[in-house]
Amino acid sequence: MESKENNILRLNRVADSFVQFFNNREFNNLELISQIFNNPESDQWWMSGDENMYPFSGWKPIQKRLNDMIPLIHGYDQFSFTESNKTFNIEKNLIIMEARTSAVGYGDNIYINEYAFFLTVNNDGKICLIKEYFDPSEILKYSLSNKKLTELYHKV
């Protein structure tokens, strides 16, 4: 059985990999995805918001979420995903992380949002479930600022 300290180090590495993955914007790097996520084709990622108003809200496979991010995030000229606080629940293999996104793209459009992530990690150290809380109206405001973004928003 792993010690408490080793479990904390393991969960911390997973959290750091998740942040680095977003900052590198390598959402189509299948090798990297397989190192971070357990089974992205079937494991689920939930996003907050009313599913009738925000097409990205609710439960979707992790890989679908990553695929939907490719055209959106690659349109940013500047992008940062910063973790501000993280807590670990060792018994549940759970990472609770606060983060912030700052981005400029599609012209001079600015996107800023605050997040709370609940990342469930399996015994192999891979993320197998994500719950993401954020202000969905920030995505809506940003997507309506540009015709191309509005089209992408409706495809998510």
From Swiss-Prot:
SUPFAM superfamilies: NTF2-like. The lineage of its organism: Eukaryota, Amoebozoa, Evosea, Eumycetozoa, Dictyostelia. It comes from Dictyostelium discoideum (Social amoeba). InterPro entries: NTF2-like_dom_sf. It comes from the Eukaryota. Belongs to the UPF0523 family. This is UPF0523 protein C.
